[in-house]
Amino acid sequence: LSRAPEFITLSDAAARAVAGAQSRHAALIEDAFDVLVETPGGGVSLTGDSKGRAQAKKAVQAIAERADQGLDIGEADVRVAIGNARSGAAGPLSANGGALPVGLRG
């Protein structure tokens, strides 16, 4: 399988959101998809097998979309993006535009 890096061009705000404080968000993505996430400037570089890169790319794009809307990205947002990428869910991190769905307990 190809382990060549794939570069995704992102805004500075989106790249910072994907990396997270102390690279915490990047580490979550790396662990979830067995890829290497690097932020050399101007975007994100993903290195790993093709399936891992494809899923990580979906998560990165979902996080970047929210960051570009001016929304703060927290660890919960990253975990939701990872879950959606794994399950093949498309679109924003949740149907109502929030980070997490609201349960019956509100």
Model-derived features: where do they sit?
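Short glycine-/aliphatic-rich beta-strand segments at the starts of folded cytosolic domains
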Residues: 1-17
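A generic structural signal for short, non-catalytic loop/turn and secondary-structure boundary residues
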Residues: 1-3, 30, 95
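Conserved residues at beta->alpha junctions
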Residues: 9, 20, 50
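Short amphipathic alpha-helix segments
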Residues: 13-31
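Short, intrinsically disordered, mixed-charge
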Residues: 24, 31-34, 61-65
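Compact, well-ordered interaction domains used in eukaryotic information-processing assemblies
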Residues: 27, 33-36, 40-42
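Interdomain "pre-motor" coupling segment immediately N-terminal to P-loop NTPase/helicase cores
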Residues: 38-99
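Dynamic helix-loop-helix/coil hinge segments at AAA+ ATPase domain boundaries and subdomain interfaces
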Residues: 99-106
